[in-house]
A protein has these predicted regions:
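Conserved, mostly hydrophobic/aromatic
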Residues: 40, 128, 165, 206
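Hydrophobic beta-strand scaffold residues
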Residues: 90, 162-163
Length: 245
């Protein structure tokens, strides 16, 4: 993997998106089974290795997201493709709504070493996902946002681009307007926490769920409705200040 002067810019330079290879083995095995691929022990690992060794991968995606185990296995094994041969930014999944030893006030004691290890292994960005359900209390969402903001600040200090993934899940009967409002508020809460923590938004890449009505909503949204509602929510939240979405 090359040394990218502006990894956040590289992640969003072309409209190719990120390739997520960080799913649990059970998810990968299920996908391969549905595709009719013969399964054996180690099939999921072999699938990831094949993808990483694909010629021209840098022309197809803007970045690759790995789970921590795969990142460090690929780095430490001579039988798998070295990350320096992958000519796209490689990221690592760090947050999955598991607070571990971190308190909800945003303390990230103990995670700095993880960031340093991932950086040394070849990662240039890291992702943390924050999920806002329809019934998530405002105080709880703010606490999660503070935690993510503290993590993002540590990433910037440690040389990783923070990729903050905000997923807003609407209520079952929410229409597209209600869903857009909830989505915008979730993104705004996270961005406000980042600013409060002193993180420059132009150093952050945002992942965002799209705005769709709840599964039991009475209204039907077209693809254009979904696109407009999603963009409206992002603009209202101030997402234009980010490195990219």
């Amino acid at each position: 993997m090359g040394d990218f002067a502006a990894p956040s810019a590289r992640l969003v330079a072309a409209a190719r998106g990120l390739l997520a290879l960080d799913q649990p083995d059970t998810n990968t095995v299920g996908m391969l089974r549905d595709a009719g691929v013969p399964l054996a022990p180690g099939t999921a690992q072999a699938f990831r290795d094949i993808v990483l060794a694909t010629p021209g991968l840098d022309r197809a995606v803007n970045g690759i997201l790995l789970d921590p185990a795969t990142l460090h296995r690929v780095t430490g094994s001579g039988s798998t493709p070295a990350l320096h041969r992958v000519r796209v930014p490689v990221g690592v999944r760090m947050g999955d709504e598991n607070l571990r030893s971190f308190d909800v006030a945003g303390s990230v004691d103990g995670i700095v070493d993880d960031i340093a290890r991932h950086r040394a292994a070849g990662a240039s960005f890291a992702r943390w996902r924050i999920v806002a359900m329809a019934d998530t209390a405002v105080t709880e969402l703010r606490a999660r946002a503070r935690l993510v903001a503290g993590w993002a600040a540590s990433c910037v200090t440690g040389g990783l681009t923070p990729f903050v993934d905000v997923v807003a899940i609407p209520g079952a009967r929410d229409g597209v307007h209600e869903a857009a409002t909830a989505h915008g508020e979730a993104v705004r809460t996270v961005l406000d926490a980042l600013r409060t923590e002193g993180v420059h938004l132009d150093e952050v890449v945002l992942g965002s769920s799209i705005v769709t009505p709840g599964r039991r909503a009475s209204d039907v949204a077209t693809a254009e409705d979904v696109a407009r509602a999603t963009l409206r929510g992002l603009r209202t939240a101030g997402a234009e200040d980010l490195a990219g979405v």
